[in-house]
UniProtKB/Swiss-Prot annotation:
Name this protein carries in UniProt: ATP phosphoribosyltransferase
Subcellular location: Cytoplasm
Source organism: Geotalea uraniireducens (strain Rf4)
Molecular function (Gene Ontology), one example: magnesium ion binding
Stretches that traverse the bilayer: none
Function, as annotated: Catalyzes the condensation of ATP and 5-phosphoribose 1-diphosphate to form N'-(5'-phosphoribosyl)-ATP (PR-ATP). Has a crucial role in the pathway because the rate of histidine biosynthesis seems to be controlled primarily by regulation of HisG enzymatic activity.
Keyword rRNA processing among record annotations: no
Protein family according to the UniProt entry: Belongs to the ATP phosphoribosyltransferase family. Long subfamily.
First-level EC class: transferase
Gene: hisG
Keywords: Amino-acid biosynthesis, ATP-binding, Cytoplasm, Glycosyltransferase, Histidine biosynthesis, Magnesium, Metal-binding, Nucleotide-binding, Transferase
GO biological process, one term: L-histidine biosynthetic process
EC number: 2.4.2.17
Pfam families: HisG, HisG_C
Length: 291
């Protein structure tokens, strides 16, 4: 096979969620605990496990053609890559993560300017330095190897810049968020030379379309039913849909078939209403993709 796309799968917190996303999109990815080279049932692709913190530099160099990494790490490394699309998912939820400025609960700091001359600990050193430099706030930024929250509690620094999804760990450590510095989501990033290759660009666009369609189907289901003609207006009035419900006349009958796509959590409340309106044969089915 002459055409091979080198794809970087993020190792760590996004790893399992990424494998699940590929599965829903139509690819089977297998990861061994002893290998950094996942298998994939697509002979046009080779996969490598790479830390999101390093994904940008490897894509920029062309070591891999395309990969998934948080926008935060792409910005941290100032990587010169093409961002194809956002893919909002994480280890906990389907929402962005936030990099926040955090101090101890009893700190007098209320805004970034109050940290003049302070020491800040974070994994996101480059971004944090640029953030304060752009605002002409002199600070010392130190790299944290982990357990960052404990450092501000123990007085090893004046503040930290830390990532959070829910804020629960920050609150549990008796810390307080001063402000949000950046919101980040996973992004599909591509090497510029790879994007200029027609075959690779087409393959990347195929992958992007199917991954995004799998994300769009999260929490959505299909619902179909039969109903008398006389109930169509009332049913379609209450039935959620992507655009409008599909209504098809049944052969040699004064009944119709109605089909719609809606959030799964709404089914439990809408089915009793549909039954009262005369709907029958209601079927709910799962969705893998919405394109």
């Amino acid at each position: 096979m002459s055409n091979i796309l080198k794809f970087g799968i993020p190792k760590g917190s996004l790893e399992d969620a990424t494998v699940d996303l590929f599965k829903q999109a139509g690819w089977q990815v297998g990861i061994s605990s002893r290998s950094y080279f996942p298998t994939i049932d697509d002979e046009e692709m080779n996969c490598k496990l790479i830390r999101p913190q390093e994904m940008g530099k490897y894509v920029e160099r062309g070591t891999i053609d395309v990969g998934i990494a948080g926008r935060d790490w792409v910005r941290e490394n100032d990587s010169d890559v093409i961002e194809v699309c956002e893919m909002v998912y994480s280890k906990v939820s389907r929402r962005p993560v936030r990099w926040v400025l955090v101090v101890s609960q009893d700190s007098p700091v209320q805004k970034p300017e109050d940290l003049h001359g302070a020491t800040i600990s974070t994994e996101l050193v480059g971004f944090t330095k640029r953030y304060f430099a752009e605002r002409n706030i002199p600070v010392t930024v130190e790299f944290s190897w982990g357990a960052t929250e404990a450092k501000v509690v123990d007085g090893l620094c004046d503040a930290i810049v830390e990532v959070t999804e829910t804020g629960s760990t920050i609150r549990a450590n008796n810390l307080r968020i001063v402000c949000d510095l950046m919101e980040s989501v996973p992004v599909l990033i591509v090497n510029k030379a790879a994007w200029a290759d027609p075959w690779k660009q087409a393959k990347i666009q195929q992958i992007a379309t199917l991954l995004k369609s799998a994300l769009a189907a999260e929490g959505m289901v299909g619902l179909k039913m039969n109903a008398p003609n006389s109930a169509v207006d009332a049913i379609t009035e209450i039935l959620p849909s992507l655009n409008n419900p599909t209504v098809s006349h049944l052969y040699n009958s004064d009944w119709v078939s109605i089909e719609s796509i809606l959030p799964e959590k709404e089914v439990r409340s809408i089915v009793p209403k549909l039954l009262k309106m005369g709907a029958e044969g209601i079927v709910e089915y799962p969705l893998n993709k919405i394109i």
